[in-house]
Each structure stands twice: as C-alpha cells, then as structure tokens.
Amino acid sequence: MRVKGGTVTRARRKRIMKLAKGYTGSKHRLFKTAKDQVMKSYTYAFRDRKVNKRNFRELWIARINAGARMNGLSYSKLMHGLKLANIDINRKMLADLAVNDADAFKAVVDEAKKALN
C-alpha cells in the first residue's frame, strides 16, 4: 500500500505558511516561495541580532560623548580617566546616566578628570 503522508505534509506546509503570514505576493500564497522566504528571513534575523549589538554600542558611545563634551571632556579622555580611577561602569549604564541623570553623570566625569590630573 502506498503511503502518502498527508497529515505530516499538511502540518509542515501549514507551519511554513503561518510563518510566511504578512509577506507580499506569492511569498505568502505558494509553499515553495514561502519556504524560501522564511529561510531567508531566518538568515536576516540571525545576522541582524549581531548588527543590533553594534548599533546599540554606537548609540551609547554617541550619547556618552555628547554628555562628556558638555562637561569639558572628549569620549576617549573620559574613558581613559575612568580606567585610571578604577571606575568600572559599562557604556550602557554611562549612556543612561548621561541622558537621564545629568548630575550623577557630572560626578562620574569629575572623578575621571581628577584621575587624569
């Protein structure tokens, strides 16, 4: 007797078509093109999870630099001063301080300035 695998095939196709929801044209209608696009989408997602980390680091550095320059230091001098002062605070937290708590950020910058002199 020939086995057609109906339920398994239908479930597999249904899963792919569900993932392809929202795509335009044949990419959400036809199984083969939908499958190709879903695979490509997974590739983009994998790549962009890495890019996202780069983008956020860039944003944090830009914010720290802006805050540091308002307090009379460049970004690189601030980071060097923090290293000399043994202040171990990451860029994400520094950027948050620069944006949301200017007084605390100024205190950190002053410590870095002291260490530089």
Swiss-Prot record:
InterPro entries: Ribosomal_bL20, RIBOSOMAL_L20_CS, Ribosomal_protein_bL20_C. One of its GO terms (biological process) is ribosomal large subunit assembly. PROSITE patterns: RIBOSOMAL_L20. Binds directly to 23S ribosomal RNA and is necessary for the in vitro assembly process of the 50S ribosomal subunit. It is not involved in the protein synthesizing functions of that subunit. The keyword Magnesium does not apply. GO terms for molecular function: rRNA binding; structural constituent of ribosome. Gene3D superfamilies: 6.10.160.10, Ribosomal protein L20. This is Large ribosomal subunit protein bL20. Belongs to the bacterial ribosomal protein bL20 family. The keyword Heme does not apply. The gene is rplT. GO terms for cellular component: ribonucleoprotein complex; ribosome. Keywords: Ribonucleoprotein, Ribosomal protein, RNA-binding, rRNA-binding. CDD domains: Ribosomal_L20 (cd07026). It comes from Limosilactobacillus fermentum (strain NBRC 3956 / LMG 18251).
